[in-house]
């Protein structure tokens, strides 16, 4: 599909972390096999660093240093990007990622997957201040976050609203 030959491949890059262990192991095993079969180097890539680095392609004017907020269904991190390959995670979710919170909330509200954009559209229609929800801040952790309480609160609110016919 890519229109290239095996001889065009100079190396194989693969995510080694973070991620669901089963998916990471399958990806690593496949990538190692391909690299070995082709006789090319295997390049391990940190999943979140890859997301951040992809922005250099999309925004060529982007130059370190800067702070990056990396949010997905499985990870939420605040990253200090000092140089193109020098990055430090300053804070991360302690449990559920922000994206997982959005996806689960969207599902219980009958919204499509992934839930980020539909939840954003729904929130923009709200007058605000209707519900008191927990914050993602973790006591004693300057930049770490926790989204499990928020996710549970939204799910409980949605179930309660369904029970009372709201």
Cite the ranges covered by each PLM segment.
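Phosphate/pyrophosphate-binding loops at sites that engage ATP/ADP/AMP, CoA/4′-phosphopantetheine
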Residues: 1-10, 162-163
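Short coil/turn connectors at secondary-structure junctions
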Residues: 7-10, 38-41, 61-67, 74-76, ...
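Short beta-strand segments
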Residues: 13-15, 46, 67-72, 79-80
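Short Gly/Thr/Asp-enriched flexible loops that form oxyanion-binding sites at enzyme active sites
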Residues: 14-38
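Conserved phosphate-binding catalytic cores of ATP/NTP-utilizing and phosphoryl-transfer enzymes
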Residues: 45-67
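A short helix-loop
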Residues: 70-71, 78-166
């Amino acid at each position: 599909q890519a229109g290239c030959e095996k001889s065009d491949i100079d190396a194989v890059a693969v995510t080694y972390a973070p991620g669901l262990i089963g998916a990471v192991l399958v990806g690593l095993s496949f990538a190692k096999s391909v690299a070995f079969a082709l006789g090319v180097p295997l390049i391990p890539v940190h999943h979140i660093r890859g997301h951040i680095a992809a922005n250099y392609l999309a925004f060529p004017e982007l130059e370190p240093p800067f702070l990056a907020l990396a949010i997905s269904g499985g990870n939420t991190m605040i990253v200090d990007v000092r140089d193109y390959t020098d990055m430090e995670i300053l804070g991360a979710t302690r449990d559920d990622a922000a994206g997982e919170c959005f996806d689960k909330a969207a599902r219980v509200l009958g919204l499509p997957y992934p839930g980020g954009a539909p939840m954003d559209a729904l929130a923009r229609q709200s007058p605000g201040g209707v519900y008191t929800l927990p914050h993602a801040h973790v006591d004693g952790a300057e930049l770490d976050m926790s989204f499990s309480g928020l996710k549970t609160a939204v799910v409980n609110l949605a179930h309660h609203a369904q029970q009372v016919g709201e």
